[in-house]
């Protein structure tokens, strides 16, 4: 069964609801914000043109599509792209400045695959099953990455929480 293409109103609704979070996710994958916006727009343009369509979950499809597009862009550049200077995606506006800095540092210290899993779970609000679909990994692998990341964050942030 061929997936049905989305109409313009459906694509617009998805963009309005998830465009910013998708761009933040692309920043998590190693691109600056301007490149992240370009990647997200390219994915939505393909949806509008009917060249791609979500198979199961539109949200999981979008995260997988922007992830793949960002990796393709990085590969095409064939150079190291620095993480965006503005790391607003790392923390919400809550907490003290010291706590926010500690969380940013702890997240930066995680291996890329664990940081990506944390982002999708916490900031994108995905289930582990949706994350497995986005990353094209077994559910147990995603669950392990999430658990290990939480353990590392807990160890790293425990001293900060005591102050």
Residue spans for each PLM region:
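Arg/Lys-rich amphipathic alpha helix in sigma70-family domain 2
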Residues: 64-84
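Amphipathic, Lys/Arg- and hydrophobic-enriched alpha-helical face
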Residues: 14-33, 48, 66, 107, ...
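A short, charge-rich alpha-helical start-of-domain segment used by transcription regulators
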Residues: 1-24, 34, 53, 115
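A short pre-motif secondary-structure segment
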Residues: 117-121
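C-terminal flanking helix
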Residues: 19, 23, 44, 111, ...
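Acidic, proline/glycine-rich intrinsically disordered inter-domain spacer in sigma factors
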Residues: 9, 76-77, 84-108
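Structural recognition of an alpha-helix C-terminal capping motif at a helix-to-coil junction
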Residues: 38-45, 49, 56-68
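DNA-recognition helix of helix-turn-helix
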Residues: 67, 129, 135-160
């Amino acid at each position: 069964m061929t997936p049905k293409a989305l109409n313009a109103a459906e694509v617009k609704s998805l963009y309005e609801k998830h465009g910013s979070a998708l761009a933040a996710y692309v920043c998590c994958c190693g691109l600056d914000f301007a490149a992240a916006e370009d990647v997200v727009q390219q994915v939505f343009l393909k949806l509008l043109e009917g060249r791609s369509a979500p198979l199961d979950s539109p949200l999981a499809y979008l995260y997988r599509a922007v992830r793949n597009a960002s990796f393709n862009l990085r590969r095409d550049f064939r150079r190291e792209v620095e993480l965006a200077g503005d790391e607003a995606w790392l923390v919400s506006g809550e907490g003290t400045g010291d706590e926010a800095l500690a969380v940013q540092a702890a997240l930066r210290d995680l291996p890329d695959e664990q940081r990506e899993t944390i982002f999708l779970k916490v900031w994108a609000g995905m289930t582990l099953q949706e994350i497995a679909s986005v990353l094209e990994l077994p559910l147990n692998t995603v669950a392990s990455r999430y658990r290990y990341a939480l353990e590392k964050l807990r160890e790293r942030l425990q001293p900060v929480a005591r102050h």
